[in-house]
Amino acid sequence: MRLLCFIALLIGISGYSQETIRIQEVTNNIVMGPFAGNRDLAFGVQNILEEIIQDRDYYLAEDAPKSIKVELLYFDVKKNSMQLAAYGRKADITQIVAGARLIVDGEIVKEVVAKGTAKSISTATLIIDDGGKFSQAGVSTALKKVCEQLINKLKL
């Protein structure tokens, strides 16, 4: 009877266990701009990926058979502005493109590419702008969007 209860307990525990996954190194393959080769950007993307994966009830483990490898491919801020007398309107669109591979037992199972954008629009009656600066909030929003799209496309 004890053996039967023990086996039933083990089956119940294994039925509720989380699936494990590992995030391999995030590589920054951006060639132009201020984020070209920036390791801080790659580290930030890895942290965002870990947060999203844990929110989806996966357990992060270094010895997991399933892993994700992410490459940052493109980063740009497109600026669009209009000025009429003293009135001005400025729109900044931050774009980030990244690719991801789902690897199971050393074999690439799926490859996806995703694009994340964040838009910042400001209007003013007098514009004093140094120009050429990136909005940290725009970059963070675009990174979060691209990471969520990668995970959704990999169907995790």
Locations of the language-model features?
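Low-complexity, flexible helical/coil segments
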Residues: 57-62, 104-110, 134-139, 149-151
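Soluble non-cytosolic domains of exported or imported proteins
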Residues: 36-47, 90-93, 129, 133-145
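Surface-exposed short loop/turn segments
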Residues: 64-115, 119-133
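Positively charged n-region of N-terminal signal peptides that target proteins for export
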Residues: 1-4
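Charged, amphipathic alpha-helical segments and their flanking helix caps
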Residues: 121-123, 140, 148
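A structural "domain/chain start" motif
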Residues: 7-59, 78, 113-115, 126, ...
